[in-house]
UniProtKB/Swiss-Prot annotation:
Keywords: Chemotaxis, Hydrolase. The keyword Magnesium does not apply. InterPro entries: CheD-like_sf (IPR038592), Chemorcpt_Glu_NH3ase_CheD (IPR005659), Cytotoxic_necrot_fac-like_cat (IPR011324). SUPFAM superfamilies: CNF1/YfiH-like putative cysteine hydrolases. One of its GO terms (biological process) is chemotaxis. Belongs to the CheD family. This is Probable chemoreceptor glutamine deamidase CheD. GO terms for molecular function: protein-glutamine glutaminase activity. Probably deamidates glutamine residues to glutamate on methyl-accepting chemotaxis receptors (MCPs), playing an important role in chemotaxis. The gene is cheD. Transmembrane segments: none annotated. Its EC number is 3.5.1.44. PANTHER family: CHEMORECEPTOR GLUTAMINE DEAMIDASE CHED-RELATED (PTHR35147:SF1). It holds the Pfam family CheD.
């Protein structure tokens, strides 16, 4: 029997167990996966922006800065459990063409920086970090920690 697959949408966090597969497609957004092998749980978030412009509580994954605490809470993990977690980060591509000299805020780059900073702050070990480059990324995670990160073909 094939595993049940769930697509994680922009600003969403999904938690899986029992062989389920989580997947998403990313551009400048960043995908953050947490794997908790001992509990046989894993989570995937599809984050749109690094930080809110003003303090705005978000219960999902719109902002990288607020996502990790939500994921831990939904997985049932506490700060005492973070040493058992593994993180996989992908996406954060530079999806806009143009003169890079005029782009002061490249959202994909900022999303990746924020993801790394927030995971380090929570002392969660990053086992894979795959920046998107200048193309989209497909990310897939299964419970045994098996994951795939695939670059999508560039379109003209």
């Amino acid at each position: 029997m094939l595993p049940v697959e769930h697509h994680v949408r922009i600003g969403q966090i999904l938690i899986a167990e029992n062989g389920e597969v989580l997947k998403t497609v990313l551009g400048s957004c960043v995908g953050i996966a947490l794997v908790w092998r001992r509990q046989n749980k894993w989570a995937l978030a599809h984050c749109l922006l690094p930080y809110p412009e003003t303090f705005k509580e978000d219960k999902e994954a719109r902002y990288v800065s607020q996502t990790i605490p939500r994921m831990l809470e939904r997985m049932g993990a506490t700060m005492a459990d973070v040493s058992e977690l593994e993180a996989i980060v992908a996406g954060g591509g530079r999806m806009m063409d143009g003169d890079k000299n005029y782009i002061k805020f490249v959202v994909g780059d900022e999303n990746l920086k924020a993801a790394k900073a927030v995971l380090e702050k929570h002392r969660i070990r990053i086992v894979a970090f795959e920046p998107g480059g200048e193309q989209g990324t497909k990310m897939r995670i299964a419970g045994d920690g098996d994951y795939s990160i695939e670059k999508l073909p560039k379109t003209a």
